[in-house]
Amino acid sequence: MGAVSGKTFYIETFGCQMNAHDSEKVVGTLLAEGYEQVATPEAAELVFYNTCSIRDKAEQKVFNRLQNFKREGMKGKIFGVLGCVAQQEGEKIFDRAPHVSLVAGSASYTRLPEMLVQLEAGNRRVTGLSLDTEETFDTPFTRRDNPHRAYLTIIEGCDKACAYCVVPFTRGPERSRTSESVMAEARGLTEKGYTEVQLLGQNVNSYRDPSPAGWDFATLLAKVAEIPGMRRVRYTTSHPRDFVRPIVDAMDANEAICDHIHLPVQSGSSKVLAAMDRLYTRDEYLRRIDWIKSAKRRYSLTTDIIIGFPGETDADFEQTLDLLDEVQYDSLFSFKYSPRPNTSALAMEDRIPEEEKQRRLLTLQEKQRAIQIRRNAEMIGSIQEVLVEGRNQALGQWIGRTTCNRTLNFSHPDTNGNELVGKYLPVRVTRSGPNSLVGESAALV
């Protein structure tokens, strides 16, 4: 393609698993073209930021980082902004950060070598912002960060248009990958030694196979879990509107599908949910929770909650706190509402004062912390299978993840090297905290 071999690059990733996987595609694509990845921006000739725009704080972090580099006088480097902020802001990024030379959205990663050649040829600024492509599904050079767990994208974009969310604008409409393509990549991963796969999408539940097979998400999930050598299958993220009973049935029927369901509720108030354009009520959400809790297996439940959406009253907030008591989530991600461009909520009045949003957020987090302490304590004495991920050198322990997505630090007679990484071990839980478990190996390797 004409790219200059030997160019060094650094990439920093902000945001979700989708962004992390996108960065893996960027790294693999550039390595295949002869570029060399380095560990620090100071050592790189090309500096990329793969960005998140879901909240204003994440966006500002990127621009602050760019300004710091400008002040530090890192001359001679090429700076590139990738991902959701790139898609959202486009060429306006050049005005906010004039030393940036490249702006590329999430559907343009395979074009990066070509764009870099344009910069080498003398173009001062290059953009890649088209969403009219499915090329991100088929990036053959993906360089995965983890040798045992792999991300696998099954759907891109979102059609839901929630009032607060910029994702439909930055990621485009829903585009499902063919089941044949998904299955081929999943089989290829197991053949390379990967034992855990996480199916990714802005809304995995709305997956619809565009090929004649016509699989829905529940069918795809079951088929991936049946692949020989596939030990664990996870998925994220789900939209409650599209979370249907057959998904739970598929999980019950195949133990390779992990005991964890992330089902973002956003609010416990039906009034706020309607204002958010979430397309379900509190009762409809709780009906799905009933499906999960009445299943054959015990599933870990996690969620997302937005605090301080315009018009949220004290009574609305109390309904959200009440929902925590009713559902008993194993953990949650909570955020203050952040106005985003190109969203309908941007024009809403009755904004909640920042100090009140902060008070509500802390109240919510305090309640959830108590629930998590209790939920984790219930696991003391149980034996959990963990996939060993590494070592906690400071504590002299190993770190693993359970099928229910809890972090478990544990002791084991093998205290040297990394011989256990990638193995599945039974671990007895002996202690617990609000965010993790502690245990000891229940069997020698």
UniProtKB/Swiss-Prot annotation:
Reactions listed under catalytic activity = N(6)-dimethylallyladenosine(37) in tRNA + (sulfur carrier)-SH + AH2 + 2 S-adenosyl-L-methionine = 2-methylsulfanyl-N(6)-dimethylallyladenosine(37) in tRNA + (sulfur carrier)-H + 5'-deoxyadenosine + L-methionine + A + S-adenosyl-L-homocysteine + 2 H(+)
User: Keywords on this record?
Assistant: 4Fe-4S, Cytoplasm, Iron, Iron-sulfur, Metal-binding, S-adenosyl-L-methionine, Transferase, tRNA processing
Q: What is its EC number?
A: 2.8.4.3
Q: Where does [4Fe-4S] cluster 2 bind?
A: 158, 162, 165
- Domain Radical SAM core, chain residue ranges per copy: 144-374
Q: Where in the cell is it found?
A: Cytoplasm
Q: Does the keyword Ribosomal protein apply?
A: no
What does the UniProt cofactor note say?
Binds 2 [4Fe-4S] clusters. One cluster is coordinated with 3 cysteines and an exchangeable S-adenosyl-L-methionine.
Which part of the chain is the TRAM domain? 377-443
Q: Which GO terms describe its cellular component?
A: cytosol
Cofactor(s) demanded: [4Fe-4S] cluster
Query: MTTase N-terminal domain spans which residues?
Result: 7-121
Q: Does the keyword Metal-binding apply?
A: yes
Which InterPro entries does the UniProt record give?
Elp3/MiaA/NifB-like_rSAM, Methylthiotransferase, Methylthiotransferase_CS, Methylthiotransferase_N, Methylthiotransferase_N_sf, MiaB_methiolase, rSAM, rSAM_horseshoe
Catalytic EC class: transferase
Member of which family? Belongs to the methylthiotransferase family. MiaB subfamily.
Quaternary arrangement and interactors, per the entry?
Monomer.
> What the protein does?
Catalyzes the methylthiolation of N6-(dimethylallyl)adenosine (i(6)A), leading to the formation of 2-methylthio-N6-(dimethylallyl)adenosine (ms(2)i(6)A) at position 37 in tRNAs that read codons beginning with uridine.
PANTHER family (alphabetical): CDK5 REGULATORY SUBUNIT-ASSOCIATED PROTEIN 1, MITOCHONDRIAL TRNA METHYLTHIOTRANSFERASE CDK5RAP1
Q: What is this protein called?
A: tRNA-2-methylthio-N(6)-dimethylallyladenosine synthase
- Give the source species: Solibacter usitatus (strain Ellin6076)
